[in-house]
């Protein structure tokens, strides 16, 4: 498969200042900082986007008091969180209590290192990209468990236990739903997976891997703890769950981390099933930059998360777990068997 260079050639006159390796490292660090900053900004903008979309969905105005047409509501919310008291309960395990939101934020941002936004824009071109994503997703479970246990609050602890069981369960289905794509492409590298789908929408993985896509969507919503699978923080049952004792910037890190994960899962759907930066048709659409198509597709899936929150009811915790093991697991296994059979037939 054709290799794509994501580090540009260094001009010869710059080699007199630093070595080529040093320039490459500086380029990657700068690119990573820009991408992570953009991701945080997009996640923050998604908050106000979600509030506007839910207001439209529910036939109301939404935020319209701060700035023209409510455009500065996000700034007001950020200032409010920043100036709130950063309180730590006396009975809490302070180290774990402080570590939990940092782990939640770090794992969400670090996972974006493997996302190829365009042929030349991406932090890391790793052959173990998908495995790295699952490693970060596994670490994110500890953030919720640390927050629930360190708070020494029964609602927090119940939320942490729910999160651990739900996330570990649905990460199994998340991984199995991707194995069909990996088997068809022959690579764990997201850039290779996107390149294999180039040439138009009829080459996208959504068609041969439709069952895998459905289970990935369900498992992605469950892993990000979004409605209707927001069991770890169910307000009516657990009073905000594992972050009930958090305030100020610690709560803000959990809050932003959740929306960063939504952007991450949306970007993964784009790369794995919808061709990444590939235009749907080559008839005039290719004049638009590849990053434009990536952002449009990602925004579509972010909107799907928002509309799911506004239209679906929250099931009971036992119903969520039963649905995973009794519906999602058989569907992913059937999809794997069909994919394996098709690969063997095509090889023969």
Swiss-Prot record:
Source organism per UniProt: Psychrobacter sp. (strain PRwf-1)
Chief location category: membrane
Cellular component annotations (GO), alphabetically ordered: plasma membrane
Main function: NDH-1 shuttles electrons from NADH, via FMN and iron-sulfur (Fe-S) centers, to quinones in the respiratory chain. The immediate electron acceptor for the enzyme in this species is believed to be ubiquinone. Couples the redox reaction to proton translocation (for every two electrons transferred, four hydrogen ions are translocated across the cytoplasmic membrane), and thus conserves the redox energy in a proton gradient. This subunit may bind ubiquinone.
Protein name: NADH-quinone oxidoreductase subunit H
Documented EC number(s): 7.1.1.-
One GO molecular-function entry: quinone binding
Oligomer and partners: NDH-1 is composed of 14 different subunits. Subunits NuoA, H, J, K, L, M, N constitute the membrane sector of the complex.
Membrane topology: Multi-pass membrane protein
GO terms, biological process: aerobic respiration
Protein keywords: Cell inner membrane, Cell membrane, Membrane, NAD, Quinone, Translocase, Transmembrane, Transmembrane helix, Ubiquinone
Sequence intervals crossing the membrane: 25-45, 95-115, 128-148, 168-188, 204-224, 254-274, 287-307, 327-347
Subcellular location: Cell inner membrane
One Pfam family this sequence matches: NADHdh
Keyword Transmembrane helix found: yes
PROSITE patterns in the cross-refs: COMPLEX1_ND1_1, COMPLEX1_ND1_2
Recorded catalytic activity of this chain's protein: a quinone + NADH + 5 H(+)(in) = a quinol + NAD(+) + 4 H(+)(out)
Classification via PANTHER family: NADH DEHYDROGENASE SUBUNIT 1, NADH-UBIQUINONE OXIDOREDUCTASE CHAIN 1
Record-stated family: Belongs to the complex I subunit 1 family.
